[in-house]
């Protein structure tokens, strides 16, 4: 095993000798079966999941309730142990607790102590990471400004709206300046303005070189910010690839042009040039993520165990 000293606390961490720093998360035949009281298989929550999440991308996990999204997140955090297969996170086995020093996590519900202020809440989490007082103070101030809660930083969280609580929850997930951020329904409870601001913050994290994995039922949000997505259904991976590639309608071509006479429109490229027209773009038209998602779910219901023909686990980032 190699030794990694890049953790915030400076502790030594063991990493896989074959670790590729450009692969932040790797699931290999990852399976989770929940058993009943007698140890008998009850629910196959995740079935032989194989995927890679690359450094610096925003990756979306999509699926209806019971599809295995939350189970996947808990396996990556080490809160659950796989029945078979394995997950590597930042070069370490996901069951290694030390890797969590380099991870930020925003759960679907932010369980924060309601009688603390925003400043006190973030200071508490900074202490958990053994951050020095001066560094902690600067980091708390920076994060409160980043999530736009400076005006409410000394109010107790019990006075916060759901949207404000989500923002301070995001700040809590970022307190340790993590390399990997896991977000479960990050825009839940936010109004349209708050949703836009949250998406802008997620995009900024990518610009800073961080890797973001987000679960969401709000498909428009995923379409807006994610580079690649995985669609799960009843524990099976149904689709994997870049959002822009998955949404292309492959058997159609769309041409957008300006300054064209009616005659020029009929003959496309040659006539466009001959008549002085300007081609704006020639590309495959796209569906939207909601239609793609619903089509995959319907196909999965009609053909259990089938994975969509267009799935591409090797899409370039």
Language-model segments: residues:
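ABC-family P-loop ATPase nucleotide-binding domain
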Residues: 1-40, 300-317
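Hydrophobic alpha-helical segments with strong N-terminal bias
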Residues: 13-16, 75, 199, 232, ...
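Generic marker of residues within folded, mature protein domains
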Residues: 17-20, 116, 245-247, 272
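Conserved acidic
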Residues: 19, 214, 285
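ABC transporter nucleotide-binding domains
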Residues: 22-27, 32-227, 231-233, 239
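Short, charged/small-residue-rich alpha-helical element at the C-terminal edge
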Residues: 243-317
